[in-house]
């Protein structure tokens, strides 16, 4: 394994883990986070599956503000140095676009090289239209290849 050519990507829960990793290490040359949950506090309020937070958190966010905030990826975004692509479907009600927009905005404010890719009319998974699924894969590989050739 060439430790100078490590990349990370993941979608949904894997997107959460991608953001978690790049918020804790600089070992990756580039990252692509696909439809991640960024802010657990707001996830409970606008996701189509808000009850799932009960499996991971005791009580509602307003009763456990510090805990929800500490687990939200905005709490570690200040550490990110890895060039990052954020990719989400605009019709995603599982991990809605505002989470990706928040994360991208934070990366931009921090000066991290980043791009936000919005896929129109796509829900969670970005696979309703085959062309969108192919586009998702091309975006991921394009971002990784950009840093593979440096």
Predicted regions and their residues:
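Active-site-proximal cap/loop segments of hydrolase catalytic domains
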Residues: 1-150
């Amino acid at each position: 394994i060439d430790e100078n050519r490590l990349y990370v990507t993941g979608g949904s829960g894997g997107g959460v883990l991608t953001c978690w990793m790049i918020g804790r290490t600089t070992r990756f040359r580039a990252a692509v986070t696909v439809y991640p949950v960024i802010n657990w506090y707001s996830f409970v309020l606008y996701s189509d599956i808000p009850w799932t937070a009960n499996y991971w958190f005791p009580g509602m966010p307003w009763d456990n503000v510090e805990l929800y905030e500490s687990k939200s990826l905005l709490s570690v975004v200040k550490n990110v140095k890895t060039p990052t692509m954020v990719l989400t479907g605009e019709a995603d009600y599982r991990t809605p676009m505002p989470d990706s927009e928040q994360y991208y905005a934070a990366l931009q404010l921090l000066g991290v090289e980043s791009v936000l890719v919005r896929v129109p009319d796509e829900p969670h998974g970005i696979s309703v239209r085959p062309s969108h699924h192919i586009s998702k894969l091309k975006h991921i590989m394009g971002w990784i290849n950009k840093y593979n050739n440096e």
